[in-house]
Amino acid sequence: KQSSFSLCYQFASCWEIRRTTRVPKPGTQPEDDDDRPPIFQRRPGPAAEGAVVFAIAITVTITIAYEGAALQWTRHAATESRETPGRKTKGHPRTGTMPWNTDSANS
């Protein structure tokens, strides 16, 4: 988690540098930005695009995993709260929370 965060931070700072250096200083022509180092040129290189794609993929993966865990947790809580407290269910006491034998075991 730390490595992906530092990668995103490095890319954000690099993008900030590129965005600020794009503006020509007063007294200079905007054409002389072609002899700058390649990181300061207008179009981001393939490394920066790869970093963008990698960061987006990491974000999507983390989001999907988090959403799946949250969905599972809410479903678990819903099946827990459906049972009335104080009354024992028939059979194994945890059959109400297991999704594969809810209706067949205690019907």
UniProtKB/Swiss-Prot annotation:
Residues 20-46, 75-107 are annotated as: Disordered. Residues 98-107 have a biased composition (Polar residues). Keywords: Early protein. It comes from the Viruses. Residues 77-86 have a biased composition (Basic and acidic residues). This is Probable protein E4. It comes from Bos taurus papillomavirus 4 (Bovine papillomavirus 4).
